[in-house]
């Protein structure tokens, strides 16, 4: 069997609230760390979310 191309990642808020989103990415085409600007309901603002490992 082949290795799966998509992996699950955790997008953690840079506002240090502990809020995170879980999403998936294609590890073959996106080799660098993902970062997205999304809504953090704890601070009620759009902030940068950076990729971390799921433990």
Swiss-Prot record:
Family statement: Belongs to the bacterial ribosomal protein bL33 family.
Full protein name: Large ribosomal subunit protein bL33
Organism: Bartonella tribocorum (strain CIP 105476 / IBS 506)
PROSITE patterns associated with the record: RIBOSOMAL_L33
Tagged with keyword Glycoprotein: no
Domain of life where this protein originates: Bacteria
Listed InterPro entries: Ribosomal_bL33, Ribosomal_bL33_CS, Ribosomal_bL33_sf, Ribosomal_zn-bd
Gene: rpmG
Entry's Gene Ontology BP terms: translation
GO CC terms: cytosolic large ribosomal subunit
